[in-house]
């Protein structure tokens, strides 16, 4: 499904609910620059075989919320620029449950969510869950203007990603 809807900026609606994605391994740039689309129902997507989700939603300006709670990311090897420049997105449901164990290069999370502002509770949950996975060292994810809860377990998890895993995290700082 590599580049399936790439640069379809004129689309306003898109029904992908009947797509069989059970054998798909590449979703790179699938919805790249679908800037007019305001909602996407991806609840039927089977992503268990997907290896590449880089640039998948880049520049999807019209989206405000994405529900990816059904995504299985255990096989994914790159998520770089996945939500880059999704300036209207204010929540990515399920992102905090992503399995990032398959990421094994320092650039696999580059500019992951640059331009996005996740709710503090979602970003907190992401930091806690991803730190617990003991991820690949040296990554530099950008979480846009997302802010985290200062002090306690969340701040400790973020600090661990930076010190133990040598991550360079860009975000909006303490809420």
At which residue positions do the language-model features occur?
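Negatively charged
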Residues: 1-175
